[in-house]
Design a protein with these regions (language model features):
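An N-terminal assembly and electron-transfer interface module characteristic of large anaerobic redox
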Residues: 1-220
């Protein structure tokens, strides 16, 4: 209602922003919220007015909840960078920049650690793996591709990774395979996985997973 500005000032000192100002259609509520928002903006704080029909406000509140839930999930995520990050300048990002943007931690893992796991061989017989094997693809090629999958799964467990990116083309010469099948399986399992050492694509996929709970896939 009107006249809550001084009350808001006393409360806001005890709470961190951003601030969401829920209004009604009477008692000068919107005008009071606009005055508070102007104060916040003048002091470098973030705020938003929620105004409209109950269904419109309910939709806004749901979106706010989803965004804050996603931010909380991202802040606890460990994102694996296997091998050197790709040389493309548009794909480069520093650990500090990622941490500042979403709170996630970049974890560097040497390529040789992945290679050692691939040579070790083996993979879990998941539902996705079983479905691939039933397609009747060349057995030798499937074994090579799934060895990469098993290796990446073990790295995820060892380093507590929630997402990863890997230099797939570095697998071609020593193993005559790529990471495409492995990354597809990981994405389907809820582990965002990007190729070419592309950090920004990995972070984008992690953000989309945190927001929607749905898997993505990195196109060329």
């Amino acid at each position: 209602s009107g006249g809550p500005e001084s009350w808001f000032l006393s409360v806001s000192r005890k709470m961190k922003g951003p601030y969401y100002l829920l209004t009604t259609d009477n008692q000068n509520s919107l005008a009071a919220a606009m005055e508070i928002l102007a104060y916040l903006q003048a002091n470098g704080e973030k705020g938003e007015i929620l105004h409209g029909s109950p269904s419109h406000i309910a939709k806004d509140l749901r979106n706010i909840y989803l965004a804050h839930s996603a931010k909380a999930r991202l802040s606890n995520m460990r994102l694996g960078v296997i091998g050197d990050a790709v040389e493309r300048i548009a794909s480069l990002e520093t650990p500090e920049a990622v941490r500042h943007a979403c709170g996630a931690e970049l974890v560097s893992i040497p390529t040789e650690e992945l290679f050692a796991e691939i040579r070790l061989g083996g993979y879990p017989m998941t539902e996705g793996v079983r479905a691939l094997l039933e397609k009747g693809y060349d057995t030798a090629e499937m074994d090579k591709a799934l060895a990469v999958y098993g290796a990446l799964r073990r790295l995820c467990d060892r380093h507590r990774l929630n997402a990863l990116t890997v230099r797939c083309f570095e697998l071609l010469k020593p193993f005559q395979t790529t990471g495409c099948a492995a990354l597809a399986l990981l994405n389907a399992e809820g582990i965002p996985a990007a190729c070419e050492g592309d950090i920004k694509s990995m972070v984008s996929m992690a953000v989309l997973w945190a927001l929607t709970g749905q898997p993505g896939f990195m196109a060329n």
